[in-house]
């Protein structure tokens, strides 16, 4: 029998950082020196770029890091620091505090870019994947201060007459990639091709957001794996294991299956379970997630079961916190979050128009680490984003028999995906 070919496209919208508190900075200019307090993730690059933008020598500029309310890449913290610096220079000797409003934060801070992934697979008669093609269309995740051709600040852009803040493009795969992160599949496919269509012009300013392109790429690839398994009439776990030879990858999948009691699952009309797997950046922690969801008026994630191989885990509590936080944030992205905008501006500028997961909606998260003291430590901070999104989407399909390929999984998106429409 000749191979069968399958194609599907997946989409995610622009995403905001959605930190509980907005960006803030304090600056003081005195005695020919400027001192700034900021919750920026990159104080060294920020110091260099503020010095470049304001023509301040490095020996006259001090930038101090303080804790903020949550930053998952490049949010508005650097812009708030630049704002405070400009104002402090205009009021020498007086401390200046800049606190962005909620509307400022949601409208003007850099966003995680929207993207589309188109997947194609040629499969043998038993469903075995013989060839895989992964195409991405996305804006850049790299426009932090210090990485761009011109100073990456709104204030600097304004002072330059509205000059566009240009992105730094796409980091190479050996550094994890950007939009293409986790586009290279972790499965044993005889033929694989990845094409990254980097969009250099986007309607909204974009930059780093937790896991970069891995969130979309893993959501797409793991959703497609479930679809291919269904076409072949095979269990989604068995189908994945049949394409995996890496013993650590297999062990993570097998562990989460036991941990979640996958084989005893009884299907229900409104409750479903689904699985997602990836090795973050193809070089960091292995992560497999099983999601249990209830889909009635809206999607409610009841429970996330997470198995991780991170090698030697030096601080188990800290590592578990990172994975739990990533899984909860990915849940919010997957079922709720989407930046809305019109021809002129971002319109989702408050919690009503840009809802995030409420504390009452946070699912139970059960994280288990596989023994790995004999292996070097692996990064865990962003490994759960993609597998969680895929597991939830696959669980929704299990509950409703509707495959939703566009995030977030809102009632409107589910209705739009129904086959009779």
Language-model segments: what does each one mean?
Residues 1-421:
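Cofactor-binding beta-sheet edge motifs in enzyme active sites
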């Amino acid at each position: 029998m000749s191979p069968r070919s399958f194609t599907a496209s997946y989409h995610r919208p622009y995403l905001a950082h959605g930190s509980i508190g907005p960006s803030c900075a304090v600056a003081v200019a005195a005695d020919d020196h400027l001192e700034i307090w900021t919750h920026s993730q990159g104080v060294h690059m920020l110091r260099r770029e503020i010095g470049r933008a304001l023509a301040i020598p490095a020996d006259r500029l001090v930038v101090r890091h303080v804790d903020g309310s949550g930053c998952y890449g490049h949010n508005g913290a650097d812009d708030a620091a630049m704002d405070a610096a400009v104002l402090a220079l205009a009021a020498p000797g007086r401390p200046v505090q800049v606190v962005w409003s909620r509307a400022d934060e949601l409208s003007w801070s850099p966003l995680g870019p929207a993207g589309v992934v188109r997947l194609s697979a040629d499969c043998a008669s038993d469903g075995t994947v013989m060839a895989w093609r992964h195409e991405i269309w996305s804006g850049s995740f790299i426009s932090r201060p210090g990485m761009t051709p011109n100073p990456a600040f709104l204030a600097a852009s304004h002072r330059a007459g509205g000059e566009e803040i240009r992105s730094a493009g796409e980091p190479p795969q050996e550094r994890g990639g950007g939009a293409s992160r986790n586009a290279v599949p972790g499965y044993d496919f005889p033929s694989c091709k990845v094409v990254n269509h980097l969009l250099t012009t986007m309607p909204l300013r974009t930059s780093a957001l937790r896991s970069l392109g891995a969130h979309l790429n893993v959501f797409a690839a793991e959703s497609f794996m479930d679809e291919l398994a269904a076409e072949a009439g095979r269990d989604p776990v068995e189908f994945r294991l049949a394409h995996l030879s890496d013993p650590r990858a297999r062990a993570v999948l097998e562990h989460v299956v036991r941990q979640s009691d996958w084989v005893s699952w009884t299907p229900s009309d409104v409750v479903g379970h689904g699985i997602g797997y990836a090795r973050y950046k193809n070089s960091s922690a292995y992560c497999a997630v099983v999601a249990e969801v209830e889909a009635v008026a809206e999607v409610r994630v009841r429970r996330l079961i997470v198995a991780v191989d991170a090698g030697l885990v030096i601080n188990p509590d800290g590592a578990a916190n990172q994975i739990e936080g990533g899984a909860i944030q990915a849940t919010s992205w997957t079922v709720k979050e989407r930046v809305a905008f019109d021809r002129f501006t971002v319109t989702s500028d408050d919690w009503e128009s840009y809802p995030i997961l409420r504390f009452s909606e946070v699912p139970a998260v059960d994280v288990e680490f596989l023994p790995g003291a004999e292996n070097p430590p692996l990064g865990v901070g962003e490994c759960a984003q993609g597998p969680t999104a895929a597991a939830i989407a696959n669980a929704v399909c299990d509950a409703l028999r509707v495959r939703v390929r566009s995030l977030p999984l809102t009632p409107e998106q589910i209705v739009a995906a129904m086959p009779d429409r």
